[in-house]
From Swiss-Prot:
Keywords: Cell membrane, Cell projection, Cilium, Flagellum, Glycoprotein, Membrane, Transmembrane, Transmembrane helix. The keyword Transmembrane applies. It comes from Plasmodium berghei (strain Anka). This is Membrane protein Pbs54. The chain crosses the membrane at residues 12-32, 181-201, 220-240, 244-264, 285-305, 312-332, 346-366, 398-418.
Amino acid sequence: MIIDLFQSKKLIISIIILILRISLFSCAEHLFFNNNFNFFNFSENNHAKVNELNIDTKYLYQGLRNINIYLALSALNGITKEKINDISQWNGYKTRNNDETNISNVVVTEWKQLNKKSFFLKNNNISNNDNLIKGMPNPYFINSLTEDINNINLYFNIRNDIKYGEIIYKGTYIPHIYNNIFLIFLISYMYWFCIKILFNGYIKGKYVAKEYILKISTLFIFFVILKISLIFLPAILSCIVCLILTFYFYSISMSPCKDIFYLFESTRIKKEPIGWIIIVYAESILIGNVIYNFLCPPKIIIIFIRYIQNDFLVKIICLTIILFISFLIFFLMISNIFPAKKAQNFVFSFTSSYLIVSCFAYFWNIFLLRFLNNTNIFQIEPIMFFSYTPKFVFNRQNMFALFMIFAMSILSIIFPRIKKLKQNIFDMKENIYDSDIDIGKASKNRYNIILNYFT
């Protein structure tokens, strides 16, 4: 245990040294603060001033000409022509300058501002009122602005980055986990760290339970921490925080639940390793997320945002639905409804199948996006699978990934039974063959006795 902890500390120190070496060739402010904060130019002494640049201010700002405000405002109502019956008079009027104030043949009507009531309420007489602005939109269409703004907030999220603008991934950007070298390196390392035990857990199941629980629970916690930290921190800070917390959990994953969470002191799972409970709940939330995305497609989310009119509240509702479904599946797994052996086999097979498929899908997506410029990616890895925008949808590639997960899970459960059935058939054939040999030997012995008798 001490050796493992020492090795994990060595790994963390090595990663920190690597980051410091990288920062020598990169801008630290860009890496850590998305270039929004500068340590070295914080004081006002480093700010550039116009008078220090020796630039004439007239090149920076050009003043506007004098404008006849009455003509400008009356243009909103239109111009009322009077006494222009001859075409020559009209041509003369067109050659006038806007700065002229003595215009005898033009009536300038007083401009009256629309009030709030007449602007938003439906009023059929608005268009007939000469005192209101002509050319304004129909108030009926203005009433739908609230709905349009809500739809804009949904499709084009409040965040400044354009990559959050699609509720369904349409391939107009490369997701962050495929575009940032730190995230690619970190996720690839974690998959490499667990890939061997994933295949062993898929084939052998509970016979490799100790190492499986230790590493796979750490992998699930890694994705949870990374998903949360990317919301609040830049990529490199998220990687550092995620590594520290992940390897801390690695050191306590085999501890009993009662030593970590005192709420489990009187429950039936108090002696179970905390890592095993994490794996069982991860399996529950994976299935729960599939059910949630089936019950709540993007059209349902649009209905939610239209009537709730609060994007954050909609996210909380969606998260509550996922957690509710997941807790139902979790309590179903730890109850006595299913035999414990079958439930354990299903957890091993399903979690192994999901992580194996997500591992290959992640590297395949990198190859598609970075080398083939193809955006038909699989949204099955945890970061994209549990995403509000872009949302997981049941398109062809995602349906194929889900089919592979469930097919591998069923095959992992059925394969040992088929193997056992073949072994039983082989044993039966051996027993029949051995019995035939015994009968042949007995008959031969009897024949020898008869021959000896005659001799």
